[in-house]
Structures are given as structure tokens and as C-alpha cells.
Amino acid sequence: MPRRAREYPEEGEFVVATVKRIHNYGAFLELDEYPGKEAFMHISEVASTWVRNIRDYLKEGQKVVAKVIRVDPRKGHIDLSLRRVTQQQRKAKLQEFKRAQKAENLLKLAAEKLGKDFETAWREVWVPLEEEWGEVYAAFEDAAKDGIDVLKGHVPDEWLPVLKEIIDNYVEVPTVTIDAEFEITVPKPNGVEIIKEALIRARDRANKEKDVEVKFTYLGAPRYRIDITAPDYYKAEEVLESIAEEILRVIKEAGGEATLLRKEKRIKKVKKRKK
């Protein structure tokens, strides 16, 4: 079970918790990411509506995503709320928790290869990476994208070769793909060749960018579709703007016309394994 580097959660933090004991006035839950820490959820924080029977909402052994509303480390008190968690926040926290589980499994594999126990791995690798990146899997993703040297100085050097091997094999580089369409016309006998040359030049220029891939698809005159895959949305938009400027310039100089068309809800996130 992945655990956080901090001893106590912070107010406003979302946590994964397991219901341990239920009473008429509330429930006690164990914090999965904070071993040995127990929290209390008052019945008024279980649901937005009036709760007649708390057991209609909570069961022993049930895992929930809750929001930390009060923390008193001196007394060891932690208060949680279920009603203050939206569906979107719950989904995001569960995704984060799954990423932490994956990071933990990969670190266990690395520790095994080095002949170290997980407590040592947690202390030497997990804690410094979480403190620097916020979550360990994000550090692994950066290493997959930019090279293992991004971890240098944060973890002991002896970990780097084995972490590189594991990250290369198991960690996918997150990417974003956006698409758009161009309407291009060049009223000349060689208009098709001019358009083709403009698209090829724009594509090849963009593909020189690190971790960027551009693809054109002919949809039928005068429409052409462009797909841009990049490390993040902002980079993809930057590349699209650059390509559009290049195509519009070349086509205009050739006496033609080019228009960039954007469609709503055509942005999607994908994952591409690092080659």
C-alpha cells in the first residue's frame, strides 16, 4: 500500500481511507496512505442530505475518498468529510492513488534487483522524489521523457541504472493529441504540388521539435486534417500555430488561400510508449 512521506495529511487534502468502525454519531476510518493514522468522520459530514442511518452510506471495510477538514498533530486528531468530495475530485484522487500503487510496485522491483529492502528504497528514493515532484510516478514519467539524469542528485547514484531499466520498460510517456483542419486552394495548374510541398515542409519542420509528431491526412479537396502529438497541450497548440503560419504564408505567396478550422471537443489525451 503506497504511503506518503509526511506523517500527517494536510487540511484540504483528499485521501483514500478504509472504514473501520461505525457508530450512530459517525465513523472511524484508517488512512491508507498514512500507516497507523486513524481519522473520524462525523455523521454530518457523510452526506449533503440528512442522514437517518449512517450504515446506509458506509460499511465496515469500505474504501472511500474523503477530504481532510481538520488536523491536530499534537492531539493526533484528523477529521474527514465525504459530502465535500465531488465526483470529479473522487475520480482524480483514485487515479492518483493508482499511479502511486504502480510507482510503489516499480520501486519494489528496483529494490529487489539491488538486493535492498523496501524500507531502504522508500527512504532513499520514494521520500526525496515525492518531496521534489509531489508524486513519485510523475518523477518516473519525467525520467522516461527527459532521461534518467533528471533524478540525479535526488536519489543515490547506485539506484539510477536499475531505475532507468525499469522506467524504460514500464513507464509510458504521457502525450496530448490535438487535431484541426485546413481548407487550401491554389488556382494554378501545379496547385496540387504547391499544396503538397507546403504541407511536407511544415510537417518536417515541426517534427524536428523534441517529442513532437505531426501527421497530415487528405480528406478530399480542399480539406486536409492535421494531427499533432506533443508532451502537453500548450506545446501542441504552439506547434499548430507555427504550422498554420507557415502554410498560410507559403500558400498566400503562391496566390492561393488557406484557412485553419478548429472543431470543439477534438482534443484528446493519449499515452505513447517511449521508443
Swiss-Prot record:
The keyword Phosphoprotein does not apply. One of its GO terms (molecular function) is ribosome binding. Gene3D superfamilies: EIF_2_alpha (3.30.70.1130), Nucleic acid-binding proteins (2.40.50.140), Translation initiation factor 2, subunit 1, domain 2 (1.10.150.190). Residues 12-83 form the S1 motif domain. Keywords: Initiation factor, Protein biosynthesis, RNA-binding. InterPro entries: NA-bd_OB-fold (IPR012340), S1_domain (IPR003029), S1_IF2_alpha (IPR044126), TIF2_asu_arc (IPR022964), TIF2_asu_C (IPR024055), TIF2_asu_middle_sf (IPR024054), TIF_2_asu (IPR011488). HAMAP family: eIF_2_alpha. Heterotrimer composed of an alpha, a beta and a gamma chain. This is Translation initiation factor 2 subunit alpha. It comes from Pyrococcus abyssi (strain GE5 / Orsay). The lineage of its organism: Archaea, Methanobacteriati, Methanobacteriota, Thermococci, Thermococcales. The gene is eif2a.
